[in-house]
């Protein structure tokens, strides 16, 4: 085991941002924020990856191995990646992610089976109900079967709500109707009964917001109808200062009646220590919140990189927010 120098330890867990380079390999001998988070009874504190970000340099995978306990594929399990043409599946990218995660002892969240975006044109152009139902079932069955027993949780449905809490007019809703929700979850349950099945969305960050209310009321209705929804995922893409609202939002989502909830795509504009600690504590204090996934490792790889929203800077050094989380756990 690589010995971690006392100076490096002091830098890593100090409450200030680290400005000098850190030996990434040495950091693997330290206690990870995932390990500290799990010591409080949670399942994981994770991040995202795909073949490109896992192979572009040595620092990104080293940080994932050292500090995070779970991986979500950023793009490689989305419909346009896995079934670009009807019945023709491609799993090279998702296989790489799953193999990396398993070989390094990381939990995996499958993301995502049904989403209106990054959807191939051949799917969005379907107008026949029975055809779309068949396509939907086949896609879910094929993707989930390949990874059966390897995925902790699946985002079965992603971003199906409008901001007013009503259901989005996607091809699935427009052609099949609301029943596509039941079809998707029942199909997923039949394929892998042991995987946790989630409905995932963004802007679920303030209690009382119409989208939160819509999610809660719909999930309550669907659960009462026997639809097998295990969890609600709150993406939690936040603006600066919004971390304080997350605790109330999680409590509201927990009231929907699922067995668990999770923060699934966390990033925060400006990455302030206060915001990040507020979010981590919100999950710690809500018994149904099983884990947090940060939507990226270092700022250059973020989908909103100009906002510097992640825990590591452009040199892959941990920021003040990382150290604040470590100190808070």
From Swiss-Prot:
Task: Identify the species of origin.
Answer: Talaromyces purpureogenus
* Activity regulation: N-bromosuccinimide completely inhibits the catalytic activity.
Q: Which UniProt keywords apply?
A: Carbohydrate metabolism, Disulfide bond, Glycoprotein, Glycosidase, Hydrolase, Polysaccharide degradation, Secreted, Signal, Xylan degradation
UniProt-recorded name of the protein: Endo-1,4-beta-xylanase A
Q: What does this protein do?
A: Endo-1,4-beta-xylanase involved in the hydrolysis of xylan, a major structural heterogeneous polysaccharide found in plant biomass representing the second most abundant polysaccharide in the biosphere, after cellulose.
InterPro entries reported for this sequence: GH10, GH10_AS, GH10_dom, Glycoside_hydrolase_SF
Q: Which GO terms describe its cellular component?
A: extracellular region
Q: Spell out the temperature dependence recorded for this entry.
A: Optimum temperature is 60 degrees Celsius.
Which residues, if any, are the signal sequence? 1-19
Q: Biological process GO annotation list? A: xylan catabolic process
Recorded catalytic reaction(s): these are: Endohydrolysis of (1->4)-beta-D-xylosidic linkages in xylans
Q: Which residues are glycosylated?
A: 285
Its annotated pathway reads: Glycan degradation; xylan degradation
Q: Tell whether Iron is among the UniProt keywords.
A: no
Please indicate which superkingdom the organism of origin belongs to.
Eukaryota
Q: Which family does it belong to?
A: Belongs to the glycosyl hydrolase 10 (cellulase F) family.
- Residue positions of the active site: 159 (proton donor), 265 (nucleophile)
Query: What SMART domains does UniProt report for this protein, alphabetically?
Result: Glyco_10 (SM00633)
Q: What is its main location?
A: secreted
Which parts of the sequence belong to the GH10 domain?
48-328
Activity vs pH:
Optimum pH is 7.0.
* Single GO term (MF): endo-1,4-beta-xylanase activity
Which cysteines pair up through disulfides? They are: 283-289
| Cellular localisation | Secreted
């Amino acid at each position: 085991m690589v010995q971690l120098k006392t100076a490096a330890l002091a830098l890593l867990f100090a409450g200030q941002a680290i400005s000098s380079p850190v030996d990434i390999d040495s950091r693997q001998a330290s206690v990870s924020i995932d390990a500290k988070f799990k010591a409080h009874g949670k399942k994981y504190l994770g991040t995202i990856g795909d073949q490109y970000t896992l192979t572009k340099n040595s620092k990104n995978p080293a940080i994932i191995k050292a500090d995070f306990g779970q991986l979500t594929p950023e793009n490689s399990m989305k419909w346009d990646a896995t079934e670009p043409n009807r019945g023709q599946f491609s799993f090279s990218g998702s296989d790489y992610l799953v193999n990396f995660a398993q070989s390094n002892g990381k939990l995996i969240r499958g993301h995502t089976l049904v989403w209106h975006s990054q959807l191939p044109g051949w799917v969005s152009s379907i107008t026949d109900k029975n055809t779309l139902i068949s396509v939907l079932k086949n896609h879910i069955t094929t993707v989930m079967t390949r990874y059966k027993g390897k995925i902790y949780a699946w985002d079965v449905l992603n971003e199906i709500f409008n901001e007013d809490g009503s259901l989005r007019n996607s091809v699935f809703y427009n052609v099949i109707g609301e029943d596509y929700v039941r079809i998707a979850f029942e199909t997923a349950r039949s394929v892998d009964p042991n995987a946790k099945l989630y409905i995932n969305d963004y802007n679920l960050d303030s209690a009382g917001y119409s989208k939160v209310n819509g999610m809660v009321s719909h999930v309550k209705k669907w659960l009462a109808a026997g639809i097998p929804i295990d969890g609600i995922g709150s993406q939690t893409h936040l603006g600066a200062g919004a971390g304080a609202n997350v605790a109330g939002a999680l409590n509201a989502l927990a009231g929907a009646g699922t067995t668990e909830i999770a923060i699934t795509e966390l990033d925060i504009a400006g990455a302030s220590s206060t915001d990040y600690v507020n979010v981590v504590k919100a999950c710690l204090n809500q018994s149904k919140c099983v884990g947090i996934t940060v939507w990226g490792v270092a700022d250059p790889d973020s989908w909103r990189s100009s906002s510097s929203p992640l825990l590591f800077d452009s040199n892959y050094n941990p920021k003040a927010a990382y150290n604040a989380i470590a100190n808070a756990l």
